[in-house]
Design a protein with these regions (language model features):
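Asp-based, Mg2+/Mn2+-dependent phosphohydrolase catalytic module
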Residues: 2-9, 109, 121, 125-126, ...
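Alpha-helical elements of Rossmann-like donor-binding domains used by nucleotide-donor carbohydrate transfer enzymes
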Residues: 27, 43, 70-74, 90, ...
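Short helix-capping segments at alpha-helix termini
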Residues: 32-37, 78-83, 113, 137-141, ...
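A metal-dependent, Asp-based hydrolase signature
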Residues: 38, 52-89
């Protein structure tokens, strides 16, 4: 890949790519004695994404804070855990304090030092993104962030990727999406963006199409791959 064709903007997904939604299992165990924190955290995340899909397909947009709250109610009920209103509010607030993956901050620092424009592109509502980046410490290594909220649709709808490019005032060819989510990779690819899939689980790619993409196991590896492209 030549310097004239190499994407100069790296747009990072937030949840699961830079910060770990499943790491809140330990806090769930502490706050809900007798509950299975990891099971709740996993189902919570699964339903959060599912509800965002439903809302987009049905054209009944509610923001990601709402999807997060609704998903927690279901996950707790499915795991036979009863939540008081106070517990529900406290648990929902955990999404404002998600832990970054260990490789996130070092990779962002190195990529920014190498001259890349770094942004977060997330389903999160503006307050969720801002709080998460501030509390995780990752915000200082980013140039900006973009929420899907203004277009009232969630990933992987085509409109959200067009919104990303327009908000950045960039050419499609200059933007590469970095995400651990196969649906996000599918959506970005369909919209004409370059992609890099972060395969943290080590499993197969669960995409709708067989298409070329950069696959890495960590953000450290992504940094190394991009360094090699620059040679």
């Amino acid at each position: 890949m030549t310097s004239s064709t190499r994407p100069s903007v790296l747009a990072f997904d937030l949840y699961g790519t830079l910060v770990d939604p499943i790491a809140i299992a330990a806090e769930l165990d502490r706050m809900l004695p007798g509950g299975d924190g990891r099971a709740i955290a996993g189902l919570w995340r699964q339903k959060q994404v599912e509800y965002s899909f439903r809302a987009t397909v049905m054209d009944r947009y509610r923001d990601f804070r709402w999807a997060t709250e609704q998903a927690l109610r279901f996950a707790a009920a499915a795991c036979d855990v009863s939540l008081s209103p106070e517990q529900h509010a406290d648990l929902t607030a955990l999404y404002d304090h998600l832990q970054p993956f260990e490789d996130a901050a070092p990779a962002l620092r190195d990529l920014r030092a190498a001259g890349h424009r770094l942004v977060v592109f997330s389903n999160g509502s503006p307050d969720m993104i801002g709080n998460c980046l501030a509390n995780s410490g990752l915000g200082k290594d980013l140039d900006s962030w973009v929420s899907i909220d203004p277009v009232r649709a969630f990933k992987p709808a085509a409109i959200v990727y067009h919104h990303l490019v327009e908000t950045l005032d960039a050419d499609v060819a200059s933007v590469r999406l970095v995400s651990c989510n196969a649906f996000d990779i599918d959506g970005a690819h369909a919209a004409g963006l370059a992609t890099a899939w972060v395969n943290r689980s080590g499993g197969p790619f669960d995409g709708l199409d067989e298409h070329p993409l950069t696959t890495v196991s960590s953000l450290t590896e992504l940094r190394d791959v991009i360094d090699k492209e620059s040679l």
